[in-house]
């Protein structure tokens, strides 16, 4: 179980902003054990963890996740892509960067 309150604190956002980042309706946050919410938060954690391994810094990874547009994906951020269900594509992009591709 991932606590939306604790996770939003780590991300530096209000709990309601977590709804937007996860791509779930804000009312879903009233049921923090919601399968969909938990799945989305797990996807976010996977992507942020992979980015942290690449950068060596969790804060840089969180900043990248929320703010840096990815040219290969129409200049959308990792957060936007994950919210829209494309976590696997972002993870593949990070793997490409690890293998020497340029972002």
For the regions a language model picked out, list residue spans one by one:
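Non-transmembrane "mature" sequence context
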Residues: 1-103
């Amino acid at each position: 179980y991932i606590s939306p309150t604790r996770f939003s604190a780590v991300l530096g956002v209000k709990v309601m902003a977590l709804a937007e980042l996860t791509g779930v309706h804000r009312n879903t946050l009233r049921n923090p054990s919601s399968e969909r919410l938990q799945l989305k938060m797990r996807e976010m954690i996977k992507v942020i963890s992979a980015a942290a391994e690449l950068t060596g810094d969790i804060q840089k990874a969180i900043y990248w996740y929320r703010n840096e547009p990815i040219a290969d994906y129409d200049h959308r951020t990792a957060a936007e892509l994950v919210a829209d269900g494309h976590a696997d594509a972002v993870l593949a992009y990070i793997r490409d960067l690890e293998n020497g591709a340029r972002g």
